[in-house]
Amino acid sequence: MAYELPELPYAYDALEPHIDKETMTIHHTKHHNTYVTNLNKAVEGNTALANKSVEELVADLDSVPENIRTAVRNNGGGHANHKLFWTLLSPNGGGEPTGALAEEINSVFGSFDKFKEQFAAAAAGRFGSGWAWLVVNNGKLEITSTPNQDSPLSEGKTPILGLDVWEHAYYLNYQNRRPDYISAFWNVVNWDEVARLYSEAK
């Protein structure tokens, strides 16, 4: 069973002006697509691996043969991370979470604004390429970041919100202004989906 590039749940220009059409098009059809292509090449002929979901694959890298483990870690992580990322964005996004997720964010971080500050710091402080994450770890919310395309799933954590801070995610529009990109991100967060993922993970 080959891994496939998922369709976006919105048009490439739907997130403008916060994330521009050209960036979304290249990010999805080139970068994400390359991860899918290279993941399929890596697991080709290995039925046991190819039958796993990409999430199962990156959650158990120890079961991947050593000669392809790095390729699966990088490209499987890239596929899993982006597959999730697209669902966390929405042209109708922004605002604040509500319900149980909002209560837990306030409990753990002090307030929604303090959460945003800590998440933004994790995103801005990630040296080079990587991701910032809000994860559920043993039932508790925490902020973390990963290098390259490493997935929190590989650490036994469940990501419910992620921000891609590779330069390809923002450079066409924001150049070296990563903090501006991070600020714009809050305008397109799909909090309904984040809340759904939280309820499943806790």
Curated annotation (Swiss-Prot):
Gene3D superfamilies linked to this entry: Fe,Mn superoxide dismutase (SOD) domain (1.10.287.990), Iron/manganese superoxide dismutase, C-terminal domain (3.55.40.20)
GO terms under biological process: removal of superoxide radicals
Cofactor(s) demanded: Mn(2+)
UniProt keyword Transcription present: no
SUPFAM superfamilies: Fe,Mn superoxide dismutase (SOD), C-terminal domain, Fe,Mn superoxide dismutase (SOD), N-terminal domain
Function as written in the Swiss-Prot or TrEMBL entry: Destroys superoxide anion radicals which are normally produced within the cells and which are toxic to biological systems.
Protein name: Superoxide dismutase [Mn]
Gene this chain is encoded by: sodA
